């Protein structure tokens, strides 16, 4: 598809459903050249319990998983279309340039040369009546990159400052950071777990989807032995560029670590330690790799975890720690905005990756276009 020659701002939809498996973030944004991004509307739709259970099960190899994944992809497409319909109520879909749909990650294995995000973008295009850009990560992996993180390109375009050394921390299921020095290379990588382990642990023991404000974790004490065992995870020893997912951080590996300690810990103690694990792994990355950082802006679900935000601030005493709300973007919508922006890059024939971030051999136009 040829690039669109106009430089005027255009409306795009961004859809994000991340590794937390909680639901769909949907945004409508007006996007132009440079750093022109204006958030117009937002919607959030929870995953139904049965769909969430299906998606969780698909993270583990099982019989007939290709068929089951295809059925889940169709269900996701219908839910995405529902989100788009709610988002665009009263707006003619023909006025929307494109939807940027991340899809739901089932496997992310750049070392094996592939990544899988499902969502049946063709069905979504059919139901929504809008062109859909999807499968953003595969082209970067084909070019030798990690395929992740991709949001640093958006952070660099929209959130960088010419004189202040900023770091953007996206704390979703996995935590990633973007290093934005005013005079230096832009880098970004996954630092380790974000909310994923905490969410899984509280769901197992209390049936909740997440630990609201980190209140359960705040009641417990950190188990030093468990924390040190978690911090010995091989992923944390790797240097960037690197990316992570459920393959590295999951309940099964946590159970193995707990069994290896030879002592029984109270569930609240484990939750407190998991929060500390997220905070320490993120802050160690900032301290070691983002020297001279002055400001850290948190987005994603972790921005609402007061206990986690306090620990990050305590571990980075010389850095101003706050959320992207202080930059004019609600922390809940940064990732969905990024995929609306990535769709714009693709529709205009412009690169969406940063090779210094992903390790790709060059800039690439990302994604596959599914016409309306």
From Swiss-Prot:
**E.C. number, please?**
2.7.1.170
Which InterPro entries does the record associate with it? Answer: Anhydro_N_Ac-Mur_kinase, ATPase_NBD
Pfam families of this UniProt entry? AnmK (PF03702)
Q: What's this protein's function?
A: Catalyzes the specific phosphorylation of 1,6-anhydro-N-acetylmuramic acid (anhMurNAc) with the simultaneous cleavage of the 1,6-anhydro ring, generating MurNAc-6-P. Is required for the utilization of anhMurNAc either imported from the medium or derived from its own cell wall murein, and thus plays a role in cell wall recycling.
Which family would the database say this protein is a member of?
Belongs to the anhydro-N-acetylmuramic acid kinase family.
HAMAP family noted in UniProt: AnhMurNAc_kinase
Extract the NCBIfam families matched here: PRK09585.1-3
Q: What is this protein called?
A: Anhydro-N-acetylmuramic acid kinase
Q: Which organism is it from?
A: Thiobacillus denitrificans (strain ATCC 25259 / T1)
